[in-house]
């Protein structure tokens, strides 16, 4: 009886570990504070995301969404922009400091370097989390690396 319980517990633990690893392997997010001093309304953070075929197929697009993780401040919103090959898109977390992220946005640009920037609408420090995924046309996760250039 004890052996059955131990086996069941072990199998359950392994399944949960596999699920956690799969979610970790497919998810990319980064958090930071933009305008930590709270006095630069035009503060902008900048990173480069490199998308590549890691064996799951070539990248079709970069998916991005942003979440304001600070306390609510009326009129103070965070946005994320993606730029590649003379194309650009934007998404904004339209409710300051709630528990929901912005709508997702995608930029179709294939493999290569995408630029990801984060900005805000007014002075004031904002903690944010940006989620980003390089994906195939069928939304299968592809190779994704990030390098941060600027944190203001």
Predicted segments, located by residue:
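Bacterial N-terminal signal peptides that target proteins for export
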Residues: 2-12
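Sec/Tat signal peptide C-region and signal peptidase I cleavage site
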Residues: 18-29
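Short N-terminal segments immediately surrounding and downstream of signal-peptide cleavage
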Residues: 27-45
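Short, surface-exposed binding/anchoring microloops in extracellular/periplasmic proteins
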Residues: 39-77
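Edge beta-strands of jelly-roll/beta-sandwich modules across compartments, strongly enriched
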Residues: 45-49, 74-78, 122-147
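Beta-sandwich interaction modules
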Residues: 53, 98-109
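Noncatalytic modules at the cell exterior or secretory-pathway interfaces
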Residues: 60-62, 107-129
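Short, surface-exposed beta-strand/strand-loop-strand elements in extracellular ectodomains
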Residues: 72-92
């Amino acid at each position: 009886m004890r052996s059955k319980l131990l086996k069941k517990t072990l199998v359950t633990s392994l399944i949960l570990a596999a699920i956690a690893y799969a979610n970790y392997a497919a998810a990319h997010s980064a958090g930071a504070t933009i305008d930590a001093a709270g006095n630069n309304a035009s503060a902008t953070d900048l990173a480069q995301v490199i998308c590549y075929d890691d064996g799951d197929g070539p990248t079709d697009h970069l998916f991005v969404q942003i979440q304001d993780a600070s306390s609510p401040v009326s009129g103070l919103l965070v946005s994320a922009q993606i730029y590649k090959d003379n194309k650009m898109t934007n998404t904004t977390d339209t409710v300051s400091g709630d528990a929901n992220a912005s709508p997702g946005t995608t930029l179709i640009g294939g493999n290569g370097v995408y630029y990801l920037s984060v900005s805000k609408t007014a002075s004031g420090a904002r903690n944010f989390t940006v989620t980003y995924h390089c994906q195939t046309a069928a939304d299968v996760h592809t190779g994704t690396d990030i390098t941060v250039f600027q944190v203001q």
